[in-house]
Amino acid sequence: MDEFHRCGKEDSFWQQCFLYPLFFQEDLYAISHDHYLDVSSSSRPMEHLSSNDQLSFLTVKRLIGQIRQQNHSIVLFVNCDPNPLADRKKSFYSESVLEALTLVLEVPFSIWSKSSVEGMNECKSFRSIHSIFPFLEDKFPHSNSILDARIPYSIHPEILVRTFRRWIRDAPSLHPLRSVLYDYRNSPENLQRSIIVVPRVNTRFFLFLLNYYVCECESILFSRLKRSSHSRSLSHGSFPQRTHFHRKIKHIIIFSRRNSLKSIWSLKDPKIHYVRYGERPIIAIKGDDLLVKKCRYYLLIFRQFYFHLWSEPYRVCSHQLSKNCSSSPGYFLRVRMNPLLVPTKTLDDFFIPILITNEMDPIVPIVPIIGLLATEKFCDISGRPISKLSWTSLTDDDILDRFDQIWRNLFHYYSGSFDRDGLYRIKYILLLSCAKTLACKHKSTIRVVRKELGPELFKKSFSKEREFDSLPFSSKAASQRERIWHSDIPQINPLANSWQKIQDLKIENLFDQ
C-alpha cells in the first residue's frame, strides 16, 4: 500500500483522478494472491494450494475485461459451476480481483488521512477508552427520551457507488465496484431482493464497505446539522473502535430538503446526545413528545432523501427514560479533553482513516468518593479509615468478600483514569477499614488480627488488581503507557444507595426552595 502513494502529496490529485490503471499493476495481484492463500490455507488441504492456485496475470486481465463488458445479468463472483475444480478456480481468480479492488479503493482514503493530519507534530498511541458508562451517567439523567435508530445495513448498489463518487473522481475505477455489487445482488440467495445485503464472505472487502457506509451516513448527517445551525456552536468528539463516538448537539435549526426556505422545525435550546456502539446509535433527547416525534421524523426523511432508502418506521423507535435509570451504578467521574490522533484499523489490518479526535482523560473524583465512604461509615469526613460496625456480626469471610466487592468494582471502573493516586488512596481507606472492622469484631488490634490470621489476610481480598496486571495484554511496560478499561462490573455498586439518597435529597431541597 505504501508503494502506491509513495509520491505523497504531489501526486494525490493524479491518484484520485486515475485509479483505474492500478488494476493492471502486477504487484497488486501478488499482494492479493498471498493474502487469499493465507486466508484459505486454514480451511483447504495443502495439496490444492500447490498445484492449482498459481496466479496467472493474463487470466486476471481477461477477468477484468469480462467485468467491464458484463450487463449485470451474469454472475461472476458466485460459485454456480457444477464442476468443483472450475468452480474453485473461478473463485480463486475472482477473490484475487476482489482483494485488489479493496486495495485500490483504500488509496484515496489514505491520501485523505495524510492531508487531514498535516501539521500535527506527533501521533500518540491509542488507548482503550471506557466512555459509554460515563456518557450515559452524565448525559442521560438530563434527558427524558431516547431514540434507538438502527443504521440500515442494506442499500442499493447504485446508491453505494454514488457515495464513492464524492471521494473518487475516476469513474472507470468504480465500474469494477459496481459490477461486484450487482453480482452479489444477482446471486441466487439475493436474487429476489432489490437491495444488497452485506454478506459475511470476503470480510476485508465488505467490512470496508460497511465501515465506509456508516461513516458516510454520520458525516452527512452531522454536516447537514452543522450547516443548518447557522454557524452556532456544535461541539462533538469521537471515540473509535469499541466505544466509537458520541456527539453533543446544541442550538440546531433543521430545514426541509424539499424546500430549504421553509423550516420543518426549530430547536431553541435542545439537548440532543448521540452515542453509537457498532450499528446501534442511541440518541438521548430532553424535550416533550412533539420534539421526540420531530427528531424521529427527521431521521426517516434524512435516510429517504440522501440515500433513497425507505427506512421502516420501526427501525427508529422511541422510549421514555426513567428518572432514576442511569443513577443506579452509583459512580462519579470527572474528565478532561486532550487532542489526540487515533490511527484505526480493523480486521486484516486494512486501511481506516486516522481520526483527529479528543482524548477523554478520566480523573478519579477523590473528594466525592471519600464523601460517600464517610456516609457509609468506612471513614470520617477527612478520609481517615474507621471500622464498619454494622458488619461486625458477619463472618470473617463475608466481611472480606464485601470489602473485596467494593474495591473490585471501583478498580474496574476507575482503572483507566489518568491519575491513579486517588484510586490507591481509596484502596488504602478500604484496606484499613476492613482491618479495623475485623479487629473490632475480635476485640483486638489490627496488628493482632494480622498476626492471628497470617500474612495471607489481605491476599484473599483486594486481589483483583493483581489479576488485572497479570492479564496477557497487560505487561508491565505496556501498563505504563496505556490504560486498559474493564467493563465487567457484575452487580450494582454497594455505594449506589447512598449516592441515590444524596441525589434525592438535593431534589427535595430544590422543591422546598
Swiss-Prot record:
The family this protein is said to belong to: Belongs to the intron maturase 2 family. MatK subfamily.
Gene: matK
Record protein name field: Maturase K
Pfam family, one: MatK_N
Keyword Transport set for record: no
Organism: Pinus resinosa
Job description of the protein: Usually encoded in the trnK tRNA gene intron. Probably assists in splicing its own and other chloroplast group II introns.
Molecular function GO labels: RNA binding
Presence of keyword Chloroplast: yes
GO biological process, one term: tRNA processing
